[in-house]
Amino acid sequence: MSGLAGGLAYFIPAAEIAINATSQVIRVTPSPTLLFSPTPSASSFPTASPVTGAFTVLLLGSDDDSKFSPDHVLTQSMILVRVVPSTKEVTMLSIPRDLYAHLSTGGYAKIDGAYSYGGPGAAIATVEQDFGVHIDDYIWVGLLGLVKVIDAIGGIDVVTSNPVMDDYYPADLNTSWPYGFQRVAVLAGPQHLDGVHAMQYVRSRHGDLQSDLGRSQRQQQVLLAIRQKAKQLSPADLPAMSAAIGGELKTSIGLSKVGALLPLAASLDNPEQIHQIVLLPPYTHGGGPDGSVVGNWNLILQLVHQYFP
């Protein structure tokens, strides 16, 4: 575990942008249902009471290129975020995409398949039943969603400590042939990344000496960089960003809650109050069916109940 500000970096900006970009309100319980309404203007954020109670959000990221059927994609990134406004604490739990788990749709498989079988409702129900937590909302972003978010804020700046050299990066933004590979190289030192290069930086799974831990750290680094740029946004900027992003994000967070989260977001900037949990050994180990990761659920649940009471 380590205290990293990256955990919250994407959460609030994504909520603000997603509700404008998709105009979708999705009821999490008992079953997600899409409700459509016109894209709101910056002045349409309703006045809301401050958020005082703790809440938990599931962040989901997917490869949604043309190899996959719409809404039947895997979730390569699953991050559980708990925010406690009274103490200004944020806790993140990165869930291994290959974790062997009991899916809410039935049977056992890698946990990243829950979304493909039943959408956000199945992903939420799976995490709730296996980890013993309650999830209030979710945010989902696809490949183009991440690219468009970063491009809409003018790119991001990162300092790369571990260079990335990946000869087997999937060339899945190539709509004519999304099955090929390409070389991705990110050198050490300061880098300004546009949306495509930032996506490559966080998704690359090969050539990092720290393996999956390095990938998780890169994801958090990019989230922090997004947060730094998004902090400069005001509600007046959101309609233009919505037009740029299109419908590449989905969320269950309604307008009233977004309005209440705006002042809260500004107060959650203390890195010492933001914690990241990564389920490395002894919490998990390899050797599961179909290349999955096996969880030591006794240890996992003890940890989860400590940070997600």
Indicate residue ranges for each PLM-predicted region.
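Non-catalytic, solvent-exposed segments at the cell envelope interface
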Residues: 1-309
